[in-house]
Amino acid sequence: METFGVFHKEDDEQMDLPPGFRFHPTDEELITHYLHKKVLDLGFSAKAIGEVDLNKAEPWELPYKAKIGEKEWYFFCVRDRKYPTGLRTNRATQAGYWKATGKDKEIFRGKSLVGMKKTLVFYRGRAPKGQKTNWVMHEYRLDGKLSAHNLPKTAKNEWVICRVFHKTAGGKKIPISTLIRIGSYGTGSSLPPLTDSSPYNDKTKTEPVYVPCFSNQAETRGTILNCFSNPSLSSIQPDFLQMIPLYQPQSLNISESSNPVLTQEQSVLQAMMENNRRQNFKTLSISQETGVSNTDNSSVFEFGRKRFDHQEVPSPSSGPVDLEPFWNY
């Protein structure tokens, strides 16, 4: 059995329409088939176009007063003159006013001018400090061949057809179902709270390592061992660790007095930890101001001046390196 779409009018009268029916007339059709007939015959009514007083209705109330429409709604309206002897139209409502924008568009039937279309936007409040909304109205009036002076005296009235719709910021029209959902939403948001998408969360964040100046042999031994066993350096690749000379605590013999080599050692360790935090092991900068030119220890710090991929991995069978001359420099 064939089904029909049912639309309710204001007086609860039902209209049975075939499936897929949409009321989408052109500008010329609105003028010649609807507005012109309404002006000639006040008793004329259209199944898809209702009647409303725009001065007594707010734009968000109009979808519920329309006979038909999902994204745009049509009405017959009588323009209210602001002054009895003037030509200005009263477009104010209780909550705001309609303001004309742009230039009126001419509507032709063939080569003959039959009407004009005016675009208006609704503003909340009172002019000139009204707040612009997304409610838009197209107002159609007779003109040219069908203008008022070409009509009989009994038809000299101010009937117009208004098409009202609500648009988004992108210019698209919003259907009535969406407007209802928007109106039902509260001020609260159902979206989850923003979360930190950074891969460096609290679990993986490492504490900065403080390297004190070496003042004695015991302090030096503990600091060197702590630096290489610190969790912040645990992510260093094995190949990188193999390029670092292994120090034996028994072979370390550091004098109690200050030594410029210790300053150099501190710079190397700080550079290593900085590179580890940045996960960039391509280069390791060594300050030229504190660089040591002695031939005995220049090879020890050579790995800091070259790219790591050019270094030769020392053989593990070579045993520990005796740095006694180095520390007693």
UniProtKB/Swiss-Prot annotation:
What the entry lists under InterPro entries is as follows: NAC-dom (IPR003441), NAC_dom_sf (IPR036093)
| Tissue specificity statement from the Swiss-Prot or TrEMBL entry | Expressed at low levels in leaves.
User: GO CC annotations?
Assistant: nucleus
Annotated coiled-coil positions are none
**DNA-binding region, residue intervals:** 114-173
Q: Name one GO molecular function term.
A: DNA-binding transcription factor activity
Q: What induces it, per record?
A: Repressed post-transcriptionally by miR164.
The record's keywords, sorted A to Z, are:
DNA-binding, Nucleus, Transcription, Transcription regulation
Whether Ligase counts among this entry's keywords is: no
The NAC domain is annotated at 17-167
Q: Where in the cell is it found?
A: Nucleus
PROSITE patterns xrefs: NAC
Query: Which Pfam families has this protein been placed in?
Result: NAM (PF02365)
Annotated domain remarks: The NAC domain includes a DNA binding domain and a dimerization domain.
**What is the recorded name of this protein?**
NAC domain-containing protein 79
Designated gene of the protein: NAC079
